[in-house]
């Protein structure tokens, strides 16, 4: 019995002599460490790793090499621009016999963050933020982007105005024959009738993608999330008591917004970030469909804008 195992990726020729843009694996389970100034945690991620295959005569790449490099990287390094770019170079170096010159890594995971209640001291709960990290080295150029998804509440300004009109009409009907009103009577009427009509509101989602500088010490995930939530002002809550629910109702009333308002708020707040792209979606309670808006720098390539808009970034 021969001791040498066959390797057809080396001994066989490709049936069609053509280069391939990317070859590799998707959805590899991997523990990753996130270490940022205000966040340190090990999380479960799914990773995609690929290299290019420019040599038309080579039948296939060495996927086990990529897997082992990724596995070793996950054990040895926290996720950072420096560690990701080092991994990309190792992937390229491991495929010199395939003439590979480019590599990319994508990580998908949920950033778990403990969030305090708005008012009640000592009350908090966990909130999950889906994160996508994409690092590439193509033609010697390094690029790293992060994308976060943030849930928030949106209340329709038009619906709020219509509701106020109905409440006003009800008030006038009740007190039209009373030129002088007691404050207590008005207060009593409001307690019973201020919800005569209520504006529609809904859970909403913001997707924000930015480019991370190659020399950044970390990805800045939580900083970006906090930044966007601060711009929106109505992030969904975790654990609440009645006082927190009341405070949340006040925030929604003070921050009425169409989907266009939400997108503009976020984009205007991202002036310190590079290549920012925004997609917001309001899961309408009035309609069976969603309202959406996108925002991207004018300089962004059309294909990049399209992939972000359609969610086809893979």
UniProtKB/Swiss-Prot annotation:
Pathway: Cofactor biosynthesis; 7,8-dihydroneopterin triphosphate biosynthesis; 7,8-dihydroneopterin triphosphate from GTP: step 1/1
GO-annotated biological processes: tetrahydrofolate biosynthetic process
Entry EC no(s): 3.5.4.16
Gene3D superfamilies linked to this entry: Urate Oxidase
Reactions that this protein is recorded to catalyse: GTP + H2O = 7,8-dihydroneopterin 3'-triphosphate + formate + H(+)
Signal peptide: none
Bilayer-spanning residue ranges: none
Region of interest (Disordered), ranges: 290-314
InterPro entries (alphabetical): GTP_cyclohydrolase_FolE2, GTP_cyclohydrolase_FolE2/MptA
Keywords carried by this UniProt record: Hydrolase
Biased composition (Polar residues): 305-314
Low complexity bias: start-end ranges: 291-304
Molecular function terms from GO: GTP cyclohydrolase I activity
Site (May be catalytically important): 156
Record flagged with keyword Cell cycle: no
Function comment: Converts GTP to 7,8-dihydroneopterin triphosphate.
Family from the record: Belongs to the GTP cyclohydrolase IV family.
Name listed for the protein in its UniProt record: GTP cyclohydrolase FolE2
Gene: folE2
